[in-house]
Amino acid sequence: DCPDGWSSTKSYCYRPFKEKKTWEEAERFCTEQEKEAHLVSMENRLEAVFVDMVMENNFENKIYRSWIGLKIENKGQRSNLEWSDGSSISYENLYEPYMEKCFLMDHQSGLPKWHTADCEEKNVFMCKFQLPR
């Protein structure tokens, strides 16, 4: 089972945090909460819907943007999209074009789109970790 304050679905635990942080601060904060925790990643549309629902329930629908664990990592000439927890990018809900390196969920309408934002911007966020098997 997930620790107190965390929501679960399948084998993962999720928890939104209301304190606004930069992307790096939020990622570091997640890793300090639970072993193996990171900013939230989403592997499919169903998980994205669940994440949005948990965020909206916790923020009484007054939330517009929240950090997710997606980031553009520059590797020499190539730029790679990577989840901070290392999970594969099997599902994307990107709103192009992207100008910045860090991604957030824009919760304004329907299924939230993922936008890039200045990594130094401070936003609320959600952490996620996988339960040991």
Curated annotation (Swiss-Prot):
Disulphide bonds annotated for this chain are 2-13, 30-127, 102-119
Q: Does the keyword Secreted apply?
A: yes
What the entry lists under Pfam families is as follows: Lectin_C
The UniProt keyword set, sorted, is: Disulfide bond, Hemostasis impairing toxin, Platelet aggregation inhibiting toxin, Secreted, Toxin
PROSITE patterns this protein is in?
C_TYPE_LECTIN_2
Q: What is one cellular component GO term in this UniProt entry?
A: extracellular region
Q: Which segments constitute the C-type lectin domain?
A: 1-129
Q: Where in the cell is it found?
A: Secreted
- What tissues harbor this protein? Expressed by the venom gland.
Q: Supply one GO molecular-function term.
A: toxin activity
**Quaternary structure note:** Heterotetramer of subunit alpha, beta, gamma and delta; only the gamma and the delta subunits are disulfide-linked. Alpha-beta heterodimer and gamma-delta heterodimer associate orthogonally, giving a cruciform conformation. This heterotetramer may covalently dimerizes thanks to the gamma subunit.
Q: What does this protein do?
A: Potent inhibitor of collagen-induced platelet aggregation. It acts by binding to the integrin alpha2A domain and blocks collagen binding to integrin alpha-2/beta-1 (ITGA2/ITGB1). The gamma/delta subunits mainly contribute to this activity.
Family, per the entry?
A: Belongs to the snaclec family.
Q: What is this protein called?
A: Snaclec rhodocetin subunit alpha
The taxonomic lineage of its organism, from the top, reads: Eukaryota, Metazoa, Chordata, Craniata, Vertebrata
